[in-house]
């Protein structure tokens, strides 16, 4: 189910609080740019019913099923990439601070009192958007609502300043001061909310910042016109939300700006939710979920954040730049089977040596690696594993005069009849390798780490010939020119190739509940250092 209309129908039903009929759905579709009538809607609903994605409730209409909700989260990756940005802009307009605000939500499993105390620690340290919060116990779960940072964007808009949301990421703190973005994802380049991605993959350390001033805090990066600088600074003095970490006109916490921009770094509205999550409490976190009357929220004590003009220690660059640089170091020769390859690395505690090696072998036997070669070495504390990175294949093609452009990395859903990406991030729109972001989502069976490359369509025959000579398990699918591949759009005069992620063997180790510290694009080594997986 990857039709845009089907996705929109599921979206309409998911947002409804009661069953919805075909007429209301048709009207809602027209508001969203789809001019189809009730009869056509009924046809789509019939198909959705047959696939158990919706359920008919007599004359009342349809409701979305659990399977439908799950499908909505996966379907039509090209439709969802960039939708995070468009939703942010829409909600920026619909908000009306200080009366109507946009909230984030989370559901935790655990003790109400303990979770509440943890969330309030973040507020008291100042790491929240505003001083409003709802936290309630519902059965065995604790629900938490915090203000979204888009609320501040709405505040700027109401004061005549147009903000442009660009990135979500994590900011490194030293001695209680923000020093640099450690990682960012462009809202326009991702199928998933950047802050949710960083939080759920364990990339934050808000507790560390609260307790000793060292750690990583979720943050958003906006730009505003440079001509509004004086007006912006006046607004900051009366800012009731007190959520600006830093701002400036040059290298703001490592982020590049053009001469007509001011960069603004906002603490993420999800930050208070990180404290219980980092403490091990199971969480279901959603960003910018709904608009709410601020009068229905409770005021809490909030520590003061001082907005500072601050440059970063280093400039944040997209991972694509690193990939293209590393690609140049690859000189593996297909005929001689000699030369440099790029490897990913994993560090596993030595007490898990036997289990880790078994998991690695299992991955290779199931063709979840680039080739049949890897390197394993042990010291007193760790087993260190090295697997060939998928970038090596790009480098091999480049050495043979075929320009291969890394495009997206993400999670590929693998079924007998179809393969499709269910999450993806553009390599040009992130400073972190997407496979690091999605590492915990791979299960080595139904969901694997994979990537998309773009190649000129005139190079199709030569690429296929070289791939056969290479003889590796690197390419999952070769697309047709001017056609989507695994649900991802490829431009005119190009074709796509889907490549298996070189970190899948490490994801298989993690799936077996073995702790693993993983790095992508780690270094170049000589192919002769690698051995067949049977020999490790």
UniProtKB/Swiss-Prot annotation:
Keywords: DNA-binding, Repeat, Repressor, Transcription, Transcription regulation. The keyword Repeat applies. Changing residue 148 to A: Decreases response to 2-oxoglutarate. Disruption phenotype: Disruption results in slower growth with ammonia, but does not affect growth under nitrogen-fixing conditions. Gene3D superfamilies: mj0159-like, Winged helix-like DNA-binding domain superfamily/Winged helix DNA-binding domain. Residues 80-314 are annotated as: NRD 1. Changing residue 195 to A: Decreases response to 2-oxoglutarate. Residues 7-72 are annotated as: Winged helix-turn-helix. InterPro entries: NRD, NrpR, NrpR_dom_sf, RNase_R_HTH_12, WH-like_DNA-bd_sf. Under nitrogen limitation, binding of the intracellular nitrogen metabolite 2-oxoglutarate to NrpR decreases the binding affinity of NrpR to DNA, leading to initiation of transcription. GO terms for molecular function: DNA binding; identical protein binding. Residues 315-536 are annotated as: NRD 2. Transcriptional repressor of nitrogen fixation and assimilation genes. Binds to two tandem operators in the glnA and nif promoters, thereby blocking transcription of the genes. Homotetramer. Binds to a single operator as a dimer and cooperatively to two operators as a dimer pair. Belongs to the NrpR family. This is Global nitrogen regulator NrpR.
């Amino acid at each position: 189910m990857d039709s845009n209309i089907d996705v929109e129908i599921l979206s309409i039903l998911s947002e409804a609080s009661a069953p919805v009929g075909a007429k209301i759905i048709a009207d809602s579709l027209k508001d969203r740019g789809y001019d189809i009538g009730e009869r056509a809607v009924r046809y789509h609903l019939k198909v959705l019913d047959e696939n158990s994605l919706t359920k008919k409730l007599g004359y009342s209409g349809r409701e979305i099923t659990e399977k439908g909700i799950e499908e909505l989260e996966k379907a039509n990756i090209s439709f969802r990439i960039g939708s995070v940005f468009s939703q942010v802009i829409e909600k920026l307009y619909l908000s009306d601070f200080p009366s109507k605000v946009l909230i984030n939500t989370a559901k935790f499993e655990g003790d109400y009192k303990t979770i509440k105390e943890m969330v309030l620690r973040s507020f008291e340290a100042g790491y929240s958007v505003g001083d409003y919060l709802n936290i309630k116990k519902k059965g065995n779960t604790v629900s938490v609502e915090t203000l979204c940072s888009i609320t501040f964007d709405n505040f700027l808009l109401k004061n005549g300043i147009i903000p442009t949301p660009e990135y979500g990421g994590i900011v490194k703190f030293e001695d209680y001061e923000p020093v640099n973005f450690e990682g960012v994802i462009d809202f326009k380049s991702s199928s998933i909310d950047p802050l949710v991605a960083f939080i759920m993959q364990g990339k934050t350390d808000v507790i560390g910042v609260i307790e000793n001033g060292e750690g990583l805090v979720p943050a958003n990066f906006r730009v505003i016109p440079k001509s509004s600088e004086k007006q912006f600074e006046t607004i900051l003095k009366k800012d009731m939300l007190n959520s600006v970490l830093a701002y400036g006109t040059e290298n703001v916490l490592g982020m590049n700006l053009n001469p007509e921009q001011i960069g603004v770094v906002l603490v993420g509205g999800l930050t208070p939710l990180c404290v219980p999550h980092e403490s091990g409490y199971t969480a279901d976190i959603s960003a910018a979920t709904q608009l709410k009357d601020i009068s229905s929220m409770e005021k809490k004590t909030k520590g003061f954040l001082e907005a500072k003009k601050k440059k970063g220690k280093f400039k944040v660059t997209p991972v694509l730049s690193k990939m293209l640089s590393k690609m140049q170091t690859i000189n593996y020769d297909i005929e001689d089977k000699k030369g440099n390859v790029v490897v990913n690395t994993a560090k596993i505690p030595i007490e898990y040596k036997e289990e880790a090696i078994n998991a690695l072998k299992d991955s290779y036997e199931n063709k979840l690696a680039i080739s049949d070669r890897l390197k394993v070495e042990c010291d007193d504390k760790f087993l260190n594993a090295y697997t060939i990175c998928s970038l090596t294949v790009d480098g091999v093609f480049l050495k043979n005069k075929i320009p291969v452009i890394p495009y997206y990395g993400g999670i590929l859903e693998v079924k007998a009849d179809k393969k499709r990406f269910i999450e993806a991030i553009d390599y040009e729109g992130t400073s972190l390798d997407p496979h690091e972001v999605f590492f915990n989502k791979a299960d080595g069976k139904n969901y694997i780490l994979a990537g998309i490359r773009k190649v000129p369509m005139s190079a199709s025959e030569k690429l296929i010939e070289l791939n056969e000579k290479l003889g590796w398990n690197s390419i999952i699918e070769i697309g047709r020119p001017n056609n989507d591949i695994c649900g991802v759009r490829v431009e005119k005069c190009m074709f796509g190739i889907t490549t298996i992620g070189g970190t899948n063997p490490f994801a298989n180790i993690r799936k077996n509940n073995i702790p693993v510290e993983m790095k992508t694009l780690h270094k170049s080594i000589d192919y002769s250092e690698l051995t067949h997986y049977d020999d490790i």
